[in-house]
Amino acid sequence: MKLSILPLIALATAVVASPAPDANSMKLMNQAKDFGMSVAQGGLKDIAKTLDDEDIPGDSPISLCDAEYEQLLEIKHLSIDPNPPAKGQNLTIEASGYLYEDVEEGAYIEVEVRYGYIRLISQTLDLCEQSEQVDWSCPIKAGDLKLNKQIELPNEIPPGKYVAVARAYTVDDDLITCLLTTVTFPASL
């Protein structure tokens, strides 16, 4: 059975684990690395709209955010290996859940990634296009979902604390899920 929507989990983890998809993001990360923690407008508190986060069963640094709102995806289990993620290693993501409604073309993900207090990424992505990265396609049918995916993490991730939030919405702006994760990559010896 071909299942999708959990690519959002892979995306949230992958975005945090390899947060420099373009030259601007890499430039910001290098500035943060060189100059230490900078205080930019905003701060970490605005990355997730609420403090009502819920742990997801399993072994991962990813939690469910905006838990007080109805969400179309119930994540039953989520584990990553290794936990915490490590530079230069493969990251294995295993997840299962239940999707209560079909997700059609036009669904989207709002992603924000911060390195300390510096916002690296704030963008809206097409959920169906992102699903293709894990060999899935839209429409995503309601029902039981499973994910088992490996992501290669580069050695070049600058050390520091990364915080990411990913909120997925249907084409009608109904919340599919909200995922929040914090990962710290130590300095290499």
UniProtKB/Swiss-Prot annotation:
Belongs to the NPC2 family. Keywords: Lipid transport, Signal, Transport. Catalyzes the intermembrane transfer of phosphatidylglycerol and phosphatidylinositol. Residues 1-17 form the signal peptide. It comes from Yarrowia lipolytica (strain CLIB 122 / E 150) (Yeast). GO terms for biological process: intracellular sterol transport; sterol transport. It holds the Pfam family E1_DerP2_DerF2. This is Phosphatidylglycerol/phosphatidylinositol transfer protein. Residues 18-52 form a propeptide. Monomer. InterPro entries: Ig_E-set, ML_dom, ML_PG-PI_TP, NPC2-like. GO terms for molecular function: sterol binding.
